[in-house]
C-alpha cells in the first residue's frame, strides 16, 4: 500500500512539475514553485527528487514510459482503423490522466519556440502509435495524425481544467478519431 501511495505521489509531483516546466520553462521553474504546487516543503520535495534536474529527468522518463506503453499496446495490431481507434483511446487516457505532460509537449507550439530536443522522442512515440514516421509518411496521413493528436491534446487539457475528464472522454476520442478520416461507424455503435 505504501509503495502504491508513493507511486501516486511521485506521479502527481511529476505531472505538476511538467505543467510548471510547460508554463515557465525549465530555467524559470524553481524547486520551490514545484514544492508549492504539490503541497510540500522544498525539503520534502528534495527528499523525492534531489535536484531540479532529477525532477526534469523524472518528467522525461515518465513521459517516455507512457509513450512506449501506448506503442507497445498497439504494436501487434495491423495499420488501419482498429489500430488508430485503439491508439486514440490509449492516448486519450494518458492525456486525461497526465495533463501536465500534455501541456509540456504542447509548450513549444503554444509559446512559439523550437521543440526541446529531449521532447522529440516522446512526441515521436505518439506518431509511432499510429504507425507514422514523419520522414516517410504520406503528407495527408501525417497531417491527419498530427490533427488528431492536436485535437486530443487541446481537448484533454480543456477537460482537465474544467473537471470534465470522464464526461468528455468519449467526445474527445470521437473528435480525435474523426480527424484521422475514417468513416464514422453506424450511429448505434460506440466509437
Residue ranges of model-derived segments:
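Amphipathic alpha-helical packing segments from all-alpha helical-bundle domains
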Residues: 111-146, 166-170, 174
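N-terminal intrinsically disordered/low-complexity leader segments
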Residues: 1-8, 158, 185-191
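Helix-turn-helix
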Residues: 12, 16, 20-54, 58
